Amino acid sequence: MEFSSKLLEKAVNEMAQLPGIGKRTALRLVLYLLKQPKDRTDFLAQSLLTMREGIIFCENCHNISDVAVCEICSNKNRNHQIVCVVEDVRDVMAIENTGQFRGVYHVLGGKISPIDGVGPSQLNISSLVEKVKSGSVSEIIFALSSTMEGDTTNFYIYKQIKDCEIITSSIARGISVGDELEYADEVTLGRSILNRIPFENSFKNN
């Protein structure tokens, strides 16, 4: 792709680093921004800077937040004894959109994947185990994607907490094997949470 401007080329190259954005799409987006009033592009740039500098991770669940404890964890109307374990913040948003879950979350920040060099120590697993062992949790719901990495992560955590006197469950397999949670429709995802099964059954049937 030939550019008549080095500044344009640099902007397109940076935009193309975003997930799912190729060079042609990046070019369209950059050219669109060039046609917008300067105050609009300034506002967009400032919003991104403010987000990057201001957003933090909740000290309880590792969800993104504007304050130390996120809105979900600080909500007294949620059941704090039921913890739904998810891979990342997109899964929290997907489950919240179903309106079927009133517990709290624990965001791992990924899943165990040796091929990608991601082990248990790179994830928020130890804080989850500590939370369970503190006695403040009555049920853990495993809601990671139905992939080999997701199942490996679920089983690793289960082994750490299986001797604790809590319920361990897994979302029902309405989510197709290999699918990421965020792509499931709200009805299917909502039902899979409501119809969750004992975790021991989930891996015995695999």
Curated annotation (Swiss-Prot):
A zinc finger (C4-type) spans 58-73. The keyword Repeat does not apply. Residues 81-176 form the Toprim domain. GO terms for molecular function: DNA binding; zinc ion binding. SUPFAM superfamilies: Recombination protein RecR (SSF111304). One of its GO terms (biological process) is DNA recombination. InterPro entries: DNA_Rcmb_RecR, Rcmb_RecR, Rcmb_RecR_Znf, TOPRIM_dom, TOPRIM_RecR. Keywords: DNA damage, DNA recombination, DNA repair, Metal-binding, Zinc, Zinc-finger. It comes from the Bacteria. Signal peptide: none annotated. May play a role in DNA repair. It seems to be involved in an RecBC-independent recombinational process of DNA repair. It may act with RecF and RecO. Belongs to the RecR family. PANTHER family: RECOMBINATION PROTEIN RECR. HAMAP family: RecR. This is Recombination protein RecR. It comes from Flavobacterium psychrophilum (strain ATCC 49511 / DSM 21280 / CIP 103535 / JIP02/86).
